[in-house]
């Protein structure tokens, strides 16, 4: 994981869904050999180890994540079911990722996200907005999966054009870095540039798919999408 490698810290990752509750996060009793035994959740593990707690896709959560309020204030948490107070060890940090910054998705691009409680959001003091990587950085990412530098350059230029067109309102969809990785991996399988792109953009509607293909034609004259 990039966060772990960059910080050289242990990272405890929790994938948040609408079903995530206090039992999933803080912990609860489990049946072990006929007895009920308390089992710490990932949040308590991170607290006690002084690790980085990563709440991934936190805007998919319900109001059940409000059980984290005191932890986000740096005060630790009282485990009322077993009568124990857990203080955060030195270095404990909470990071959350969210596609909508906790404001929900009005355009429907991130269906399932929710508007999070304002008091909950206020407990995150710093927000970083992560744009797409520059073409140079994106090329380095793709180079981990593909050796064709020429193809990588064309893909990065293509994605950059699509994103600028999207921002200008010319198209309704965008190509992510993850989608580019899918494409170069498909290229390693098929050995065909056009087929790799087509198979990986077929999840979009036909109009968007054709628009993407036409935009790629502008950066790579050697590729044809004709059947």
Residue ranges and their predicted role:
Residues 1-227:
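C-terminal regulatory/interaction module of P-loop NTP-utilizing enzymes
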